[in-house]
Amino acid sequence: MKKYIIALSVALTPTLTFAQTAVSKGDPAAGKAKAVAICSGCHGIVGTQTAFPEVYKVPKIGGQNADYLVVALKAYRNGDRNNETMKGLASALKESELADLAAYYSQK
């Protein structure tokens, strides 16, 4: 039984590692162009915790983990996160554009 558990652990380790890093790596330069076009109106404001209208809090996404950003954008797109503006924007993005934006913001 002990050998079985060890063998199973060794066999599953690469699978679990891959699952955590399965988000495709994007192109930061392409992400910057997309960010300027659609994201900077809210996320590009100095002091990113407020934007127009001031009642909405805009999170700081610069320096955030790229995988987290992709997951968050997908959550907006499929309705798991509730923000109509972000849902509309995320729904218009291709998978490669999600990865590009995430790569750009993760390097800020």
Predicted features and spans:
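A structural feature that tracks compact, well-ordered secondary-structure segments
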Residues: 59, 71-76, 89
